[in-house]
Amino acid sequence: MSARISFLKNPDPCNHLSDYKLRYGTDGYKSFNNLFRCFNDARIKIKLQGIDIPRCSYCSVYQKRLYICLICRSISCSSHILLHTQLNKGHDIAIDVERSELYCCACIDQVYDSEFDEVVVSKQLFGLGMSVKSGADVVAVRSNKKRRLDSQLIIGSNFLVSPRDRREKWTFPLGLRGLNNLGSTCFMNAVLQALVHAPPLRNFWLSGQHNRDLCPRRTMGLLCLPCDLDVIFSAMFSGDRTPYSPAHLLYSWWQHSTNLATYEQQDSHEFFISLLDRIHENEGKSKCLYQDNEECQCITHKAFSGLLRSDVTCTTCGSTSTTYDPFIDISLTLDSMNGFSPADCRKNRYSGGPSVNAIMPTLSGCLDFFTRSEKLGPDQKLNCQSCGEKRESSKQMSIRRLPLLLCLHVKRFEHSLTRKTSRKIDSYLQYPFRLNMSPYLSSSIIGKRFGNRIFAFDGEGEYDSSSSSSPSAEFEIFAVVTHKGMLESGHYVTYLRLKGLWYRCDDAWINEVEEEVVRGCECYMLFYAQETVIQKAHKELSYQVISMADAFPFADC
């Protein structure tokens, strides 16, 4: 989709928010200043005087998501928020009590306003005992050649993490920076944090291989997602510690994915796939990965592209037909019937119930299930060239070539078309921080099929099942995207592993966590990098805080 845009313009607010600001300006925001409370984790929540547990004024429920009207301060749950605005004309804008985010009752959607964020972040800094700048300095927009950042809140402040980590924040690895939630955009922030710290992508953008100042699309005023990502990478590695608002990238992605252009909660995995597709298209490459025996050279496929092998074997004559398909991620089935939910784990821990480790799903089990031999049903008979007719057959997947970066997607969301129902699988999944993918390679799978005999494999030499693992099959984890909560109203958080330590990236909030916290989360997307890539990144990327005058460091991959 070709479009000319202003690159320094945030997405427009909805009409209801615009009408509210015409009538009340920002006075309504400021009137809530005495209700905002800064808690120990640096989050801002609304605390009503004399009310310990807020409840919906219509049904008295307190366990659902609650919203407080900006005009009358009436509290409504998610089931009655629309009713409130229907009964009270003009009462369209409310605040999420738990997350202190703006919500439009008429649009049934979260909305973003930088002036509201200014009030909230000012309260955060005040609660953390830090100085707050005023006037134009508070939301000044920088136009530095290296960083064209917008919506910067409280520039020059020291806010990044909770009070527990404040004294140590400057020892955090370079690139750790919070991302503001622009209205149910945690799905985007979670993926961006993982991609920003992926060594090949970090190397690509910080070394100027896609320079927004030289991009022909950008100079013509056209949309270019790689240019927007260039801005993101420059901002994240600038040394600035204030939370950053990726509004330009969100707007640009909306233009490319018009069906997803909404402030409603989206799926992180869908965003990941969509973003990589848009990067591929914007770099002007062919959509076909393999054409005339040449692989696509865009950064998306250089980093994430692997090759799957599919063997379909006739159960009558034993002949095998082989096909190859490229992939940029692998989706794994999570067997919820044999797994523990978070509540089960807590219950069994104290009641002496069955061992959690005994029946908890594991990543190796999911990969075994993915590469198992599967008998196709009678309605899936395929034409066997040897038999000359349709025969029943079996199918087995394996990995012919591994990518530099391996993304494993855990299928937690189930949608039934026949029953018209959807549900989320909350089972825990055990996964290693170091992963050996050798057992799932085509060489290993075929070796087992033929009794681990030595044989010629694809004309590329002899395969010996006893040979040691290839270094390229050893992977180390560097990011985990998690999903917590219900299907429609959950929340995405990313855990990053940098220099052997783990950091929790929850929108604008970043803090260091213990390894056990990461192992106990509900993983949704697992990002691994080849061990050699991680080792080279550790050697060549400096984690010292740099000023804007310094050159950006980068790591070869």
From Swiss-Prot:
One MF term in the entry's GO annotations: cysteine-type deubiquitinase activity
Positions that bind Zn(2+) 1: C56, C59, C77, H80
Zinc finger (UBP-type): 36-130
Biological process (GO), any one: proteolysis
Stored Pfam families: UCH (PF00443), zf-UBP (PF02148)
Entry binding sites for Zn(2+) 2: C69, C72, H84, H91
InterPro entries: Papain-like_cys_pep_sf, Peptidase_C19_UCH, Ub_carboxyl-term_hydrolase, USP_CS, USP_dom, Znf_RING/FYVE/PHD, Znf_UBP
Active site per UniProt: C186 (nucleophile), H491 (proton acceptor)
Descriptive protein name: Ubiquitin C-terminal hydrolase 22
Source organism (scientific name): Arabidopsis thaliana
